Amino acid sequence: MKKVHAPIHPGEVLLEEFMLPYGISQYEVAKVIGVSPRRINEIVHGKRSITADSALRLARAFSMNDAFFSNLQADYDLAIERDRLEAVLPNISVLPAVAKAMLKTAV
């Protein structure tokens, strides 16, 4: 399956959807959430993942639910790995015991 576009790093979402519209600088975000400006810079430039620690801090600062930024990161990571394993995943079959159990519940 050919991908239409590359997955969007959650740092790009942070920058484009949360920081730029409100005129918020990387320094301001870092100061408010208590992390180094370098961490925010690396996140918005796609050089660093959003950890659970960063996700919780960002969620509080931007009034989002606790899982918002970690879900963005998880979705991004899955998309990257899905692309990387594109040739492998179709060759993995359901475990026989699971397939058997699924047949029993389908009846």
For each feature predicted by the language model, list its residue ranges:
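The DNA-recognition helices of helix-turn-helix-type DNA-binding domains
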Residues: 36, 47, 62, 73-76
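Short alpha-helical DNA-recognition segment
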Residues: 23-42
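A short, Lys/Arg-rich alpha-helix, primarily the initiator
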Residues: 1-24
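Short, basic-rich loop-to-helix N-cap that marks the start of a DNA-contacting helix
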Residues: 47-60
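Short, charged recognition helix plus adjacent turn
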Residues: 71-107
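Peripheral/terminal regions associated with large enzymatic or DNA-binding modules
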Residues: 2-7, 60, 66-68, 104
